Amino acid sequence: YLVHLCSRPFVPELRCTLGRETAIQKMMWTEDNWLRMADGSNLAKMEVPESSLPEYPVEKTPDFDDFDGEELGNFYYAPRIMPERFADVKARKGYVRLRGQESRTSLNKVSILARKLTSVYARITTKMEFVPEVHQHSAGLILYYDNMNYINLRKYYSETLGQSALSIIHLENGEKTEFLNTRIPVEDKPIYLRLYIEGRKSWFEWSYDGENYQKIGRIFDTTRFSDEYCKYGEFTGTMVGITCADRVLHKKCADFDFFEYKADEIILKEIWTENGYD
């Protein structure tokens, strides 16, 4: 067997939203000691025969993280700095507390705790407690490629409304759009935030009880989160995560009760049909 790098692009655009991935192929040695594909071709296979070697179980990355442990899971990523610099699972039992830092466009210190997107059919959910006091305080759920390309469903303090609100910020190759026409005033109590990714289409929903969700904002093009579309990317692949910003004092915190990442193409296609999105 041989392990190799690959990508699974959207076609016909050839946009690799999942970035660089790892695959395995069954090989054979020829009589003159060359390594060849087992079937004699030179094309990578989507499905490969299993090896007869003994199994070596590897711990699976959990779909659901309730943050009950003493340490943050090693499957999380953060731009440029270690997650422990701003994410604390000991401050409040059963939660991760994110300390807000600079704007998400910053190339210095930002508070984004993320996981790699491993399928373009996924559902990401979190439960957040956050009470913004000024406009520069915000926290929420993010679909992130780099500091110039992301979609952020955020709770923040709206000076126009005079209270907390939910709205979506979209950066596309550095061009910022805030969808104020879909802004929603919300109460300062626990709130569920959810992101659906269904192939080329991605959208956000929110709920107070975790049962009855409301869609917010428009549907976004998943394929644009790729090196082939983004001008500033480094082929890291798209990330999904939670985030907090305090552009004043870098002290304001948001508490997240859990982070759930479910990637299942069959289930998500059914959900898409049930909700009537076409």
For each feature predicted by the language model, list its residue ranges.
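Carbohydrate-active catalytic/glycan-binding domains of CAZyme proteins
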Residues: Y1-D278
